[in-house]
Amino acid sequence: MRGFMSKDGNLDTSEFDTLANKEYTAEQKQTLEQGQKEFLSQTTTPELEADDGFIVTSASFAQSTPSMSALSGNISPDSQTSDPITKAVRETIIQPQKDNLIEQILKDLAALTDRDLAEQKRKEIEEEKEKDKTLSTFFGNPANREFIDKALDNPELKKKLESIEIAGYKNVHNTFSAASGYPGGFKPVQWENHVSASDLRATVVKNDAGDELCTLNETTVKTKPFTLAKQDGTQVQISSYREIDFPIKLDKADGSMHLSMVALKADGTKPSKDKAVYFTAHYEEGPNGKPQLKEISSPKPLKFAGTGDDAIAYIEHGGEIYTLAVTRGKYKEMMKEVELNQGQSVDLSQAEDIIIGQGQSKEQPLITPQQTTSSSVEPPQYKQQVPPITPTNQPLQPETSQMQQSQQVTPNLLNTATALSGSMQDLLNYVNAGLTKEIDSNKQIDLIKEAATAILNNEKSDIAEKQANIIALAENTVNNKNLKPDAKVAGVNAILETIKNDQNTPNLEKSKMLEATVAIVLNSENLESKQKQQMLEKAVDVGLSLKDDASRAATIDGIKDVVIKSNLSTEDKGTMLIAVGDKVNVSELSNAEKQKLLGSVLKKDVEAQVLSPAQQQLMQQHLDKITAEQTKKDTIKKVNDILFDPLSNTELKTTNIQAITSNVLDGPATAEVKGEIIQEITNTVAGSSLEAQDKAAIIKGVGETIATHSDTSLSLPNKALIMASAEKGIAESQTNLPDRELMTKGLVDGIYEGKGGPEITKAVSSGIDNSNINDSEKEALKKAKDAASEAALDRDTQNLTEGLKGQNIEEHKPHDDIYNKAREVINAVNPVIEALEKSKEPVVSAEDRIVQETSSILNNISKLAVEKVNNLRAMLSPNGNLKTLEEKKEESIKKVDELVKAFGTKSSTEEQQSFIKTNLIDDKTLSKEVRLQTIDKLLQEQKRAEAIENPSVKTEDVRVVSGKSKLKPISKDNPDIEKAKMVVGRDRVNIKGNIKIMGALMNARDIIQSENLNKSIPIKRESSPPQR
């Protein structure tokens, strides 16, 4: 569990530096093995309190110490390792832990439903084990992380790993301690109290040369009592802990230093040596000889008692809570320094508070097992959920059995117990007599509670008998005519509460009692639906309070089946099941467990067809919400894994976070939920410890991913909504304003890189407006956004200028009507001519048939020619409305002017783009020539704007054609874009606003020019008629 996990969360194949060039003797090896056996077999042997720390003095060796970076790879084979401590830890701790873990993984694979995957992984393990018994490749493969995590969640395996670890390190420390005669072995740290304050202590750490490396200060904090929740739901009170000011930078003297501080118990005292765990900081000698913080070692998982920087760290180990001597703020500061020094964080449970001072000796120093590189501590503010903290002024009351509580408040309990000594029927008779005699409903409920307590505490009954008696008591309560309806509800709920508080009944048996009680209630004819629902909800509450997830799942499944099989109407069944779902939804369970329970309820309910469509939709909404929350949590965990991976550069981090963003956008969640997740992503990136430029690069990638995402799966309004959320995450981050400005620019750059439209860019401003920051910060971020937009538009202007070079905008001259009609006749006759040409193929039939076919073809030509000539004659008549070329040109110029004038009435870019599409591209009633002339004129005239008298005033609506400065037609070789920019230089915003319009016009021109026209085919004439 700890002792072999790497920083990226994978099993590490490296362990620690060699200690000395010394082999185990047979006697030493036998001593170690015997010590471990004795430790694992002992029960309650008294242990001494763990010392606060040790000092290890380096010994002199001729060989230099291997660097930590060299040890981050695979462990050398046993034959290449002569260090006795390395061998001891490998053989007694690391390898046994790995063996146990693999054994559990194989068990989990055997139960896996995907048999192909299970067999693949099983073979992978077996094949690798033949090559390398440490399975370093398997443990180092990220694809195997889910199997490792699942195995580590097994309670029995956790116990085994903790036992192996504690026993192994205890034996190593005992064997290699100074007290055991080992040269340079472990010695206690000497803390000295401050004269002025009893809660302050200090110690000076020196290297071998006697030079001071640093002074450590320890502060004992006595705080207002607060409680921490353990994994099993129980709470522990904390009122005292300590903080140690671990140094970040060391520049006094040369050498190395290793600080390992013992974790304190919940009451602020030190644990016994056999239960001690540690927080360790490793300072390795840097290039300049000064110590650098390279590693952090701590038990896993590391949690913090709050969200502030002063929140103290704590862990749960062996079912107990221990506080560590580091705060959240100090931990973040240390982790940043570790990353800066390219070190790695590791997870170890040490056996003593240890300070290892190493001097500037050219000979090999002595290094302890505390230098092992094992499981990593992920940044806890992201990796681990902080459990609820409940401040209290009162000490926690000791847990007592229900029997003891009842004896204090209920003097008649002895009577019910006496009644039960005869038979269950005697007890029921006693209870019923009391319910008849007693009018006060509170006393009636107390009597029912007494009976339930007597049943569960009856030592003469086994579990089956207790269960049967509880069911009989519940049925008696429901059917008792002397109880009012509300008293029946309170009486059954009292029975359920008694079941909950009983310390002797196993959880699964409690689950059966709850299920049976619900069955009695739902099938009773003496209760209304409202009262049944109240009792059902109480039973669900009790079931969800059980200590293990298997019992909770069994209870909910059981109650669900009871509802479906009950004699309730279909409508009432649906109501009851919705009540079960609501209780699960509002419980304190994790989202993952809620998701599992609700999914199970919904599936069974749909199969049984007891939920109405509206009820199904309601439960599905609850499930979707929980799924979205779990997805958000999982997504941010992945983002943090990427951000804190010291082995990946900014480009790789950007690519990986872009992939996560794309997965979110493709997911089934609503746009609002997707926006919330994207906001968390950008907020997490912005708040990370990366450099500002790196964060801006990652944010740019997120913006580009959103802008380029498929419009079919994500509509434009939804893209804008999500982009606004992305900017809100940046704006509301806790990083400084200049960094946020840089990241806002990065987001805008990403939008332009992804060819996002104006709606997407405007969404950035919307995100700023909706963020919870002050007005001055909003203004600064908007300026940053505008600056990025302006820079992007400048690039577009330059690209447009380059794109226009070499293009020739020619005037398209319309043909007159006569030419067009003649061309139409030619095009119609051509197919007939082609058919006639085919008749010239080699003659294969009789002469008469050839004459007949030729006559038919000529007849078709004659009819078609007559039809076209008549049409031409009608057109040439006085009523034919025939227009000359000059008239046609004048009409075209007029139509072009009308279109240009209509275009000028459109004030916004969106309206102008719509006009181009509707009137120039889609309107085929206008001739191709008119539309192309309109586009050419708009391209020439659109870019001219009259200079504004006041140069400081810039608006996007200034579109007055200048009469003083005219732009020459764009030539083929040198388009005069630069001149246009000079003419309206004081209103550059106008040009930039029209860049998109110019692009739209050129795009429309290309579309019109590519429209398919019937190509004319010249009539082929033969020199002589066909041969007969």
Swiss-Prot record:
It holds the Pfam family 120_Rick_ant. It is found in: Cytoplasm. Keywords: Cytoplasm. One of its GO terms (cellular component) is cytoplasm. Residues 359-405 are annotated as: Disordered. Its main location: cytoplasm. This is Antigenic heat-stable 120 kDa protein. Residues 359-384, 391-400 have a biased composition (Polar residues).
